[in-house]
Amino acid sequence: MKLAELRSLISDRKSEDLQTIIVELYKKIPKKTIEEHRMDELVRDPGSYAGLAKALKSEPQRTLDELEPDIVEFVADAKNQYYFAPNSIIRKKDRPKWRFIVKRFIHDLQLTTDTPEDTAKAAELLEQLYALLCEATEHILFSTDDPFRSVGIAQERLYSIIVQMLRRDAPPKKWVAKAISLAIDHSLGRDSLHETLWLALLDHLNTAPLKELAIEEAERFLAGAKAQLRLVTKKSRDAWNKERALSNKIESLTELVLYCRFALSEYEEGAQFFLQHDPASSREVTYFRLLLRLLRADQKDLWLRFYQQAIREGVPVRDSLTKANQTITETGRLPAYL
């Protein structure tokens, strides 16, 4: 069938029919073809796929030795704002092409993992690109404030790709610690939360020992962050920024332990840990955040227990929590949302 005939046949199809066609066609595509041609990106963002496909076809597959100096140079140029501000290094017409350069790098690096050494190096280079995109969410490096969206890849997706590479060869303790560090040491994109990164990490923590190891490493990072926070003196704006960053890190690590405990079906242990370590400015906020997560985990009995505990402690509770408690009392079920 020619493309013109195909377009004609599908032009008036119902959306349900198109979904069926796409899913069945996707099932028939070999995994290698999906990866090489970034077919998942076509599904996620059809609008930008034409530019990506053009970039992928523009030059042959490069080796890791060829990629490394190009990536190092690109990262340095980007940090110098050569892809944003007027300069004599990157021509004006080439500056908007940075997104296609990054797409190509990410694509090529995933195809250069034939040996453990190559995998480790590819992961390291991907980490540099990840860190750059994270930095570009807070500082002007490109003509966008949402670099992950511009590149056409979700932050948690790129994070997951890196974690997958890290775990191929590194000992569990090493790659788990690296994965946690990668999440807490870099900024979040506009559409990202630490929660989405932790859920991506949990996909790789597919055994109980790995989840327990993640708890151990998260608690180690947490102790370090709390020790640093105690040393911050509140005498300058820089100190305020540092305090805020450390508090965010503590909040994120506390959340990771909670999710790992929940994944181990240790709901009460996770909830108690969260209450003890969450750095929110008030107990009202901490209890709300905990009860929200217990609701998502469908833990009705624990939800009621901690709601009643908050009342006994004299903690003000939000109207949404009061209504949720009423719903449980009347129906015996948790509400769908708060």
Annotate the PLM regions:
Residues 1-38:
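Basic helix-extension-helix modules of the SAP/HeH family
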Residues 34-338:
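Eukaryote-biased, non-catalytic alpha-solenoid scaffold regions
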